[in-house]
Swiss-Prot record:
HAMAP family recorded: Nuclease_YqgF (MF_00651)
Natural source organism: Bartonella quintana (strain Toulouse) (Rochalimaea quintana)
Name of the featured protein: Putative pre-16S rRNA nuclease
Organism lineage string: Bacteria, Pseudomonadati, Pseudomonadota, Alphaproteobacteria, Hyphomicrobiales
Pfam families, alphabetized: RuvX
UniProt keyword Hydrolase, yes or no: yes
Task of the protein: Could be a nuclease involved in processing of the 5'-end of pre-16S rRNA.
Coiled coil: none
Main location: cytoplasm
PANTHER family: POLYNUCLEOTIDYL TRANSFERASE, RIBONUCLEASE H-LIKE SUPERFAMILY PROTEIN (PTHR33317:SF4)
EC number: 3.1.-.-
Length: 159
């Protein structure tokens, strides 16, 4: 597995493969998966974190089931663009995943993604209890949708 740049994503996908989005938290991992056309992000489950080996095995099962070729993972930068402890924890998680999968990862700036996801759930009138269980997968979908939009723009610009 390698960490790749957003402009390399298309070259790493086989026909029919999807892209996964992850929102890595201390206790949970929000998961989203694109459609096969790489246009829409769809929230999936929220994984309750246990330990790396268990989390990695569960993620790989999801990636296999969803035919994932690339993973976009939110990088929680500080508002000034600097890296803090959460960004370092995300980088460490991706480095540790190298032992479990060959699927490449892309870091994606996730600043304000959770706020945007919560606002979206509020607009859909989702109850507080349901918001708490859905916020991480909604944030993953928001992260993934931003990356998908960028991929579409790159593809459009290339002709």
């Amino acid at each position: 597995m390698a960490v790749i740049n957003i402009n390399e994503v298309i070259t790493h996908l086989l026909p029919g493969q999807t892209i996964a989005g992850l929102d890595l938290g201390k206790k949970t991992i929000g998961i989203a998966v694109s459609d096969r056309g790489l246009t829409f992000s769809n929230p999936r489950s929220v994984l309750q974190r246990k330990k790396l080996t268990v989390d990695a095995r569960t993620l790989i099962q999801i990636f296999d089931r969803e035919n994932v070729g690339v993973v976009i993972i939110g990088l929680p930068l500080n508002m000034n663009g600097s890296s803090g402890p959460r960004a370092q924890a995300t980088r460490t998680f991706v480095n540790n995943m190298e032992a479990y999968t060959e699927i490449p990862f892309v870091f994606w700036d996730e600043r304000l993604s959770t706020i945007a996801a919560e606002r979206s759930l509020l607009e859909m009138d989702v109850s507080r209890a349901k918001r708490a269980t859905r916020i991480d997968s909604a944030a993953a979908a928001f992260i993934l949708q931003g990356a998908l939009n960028r991929i579409q723009n790159l593809h459009y610009m290339e002709g």
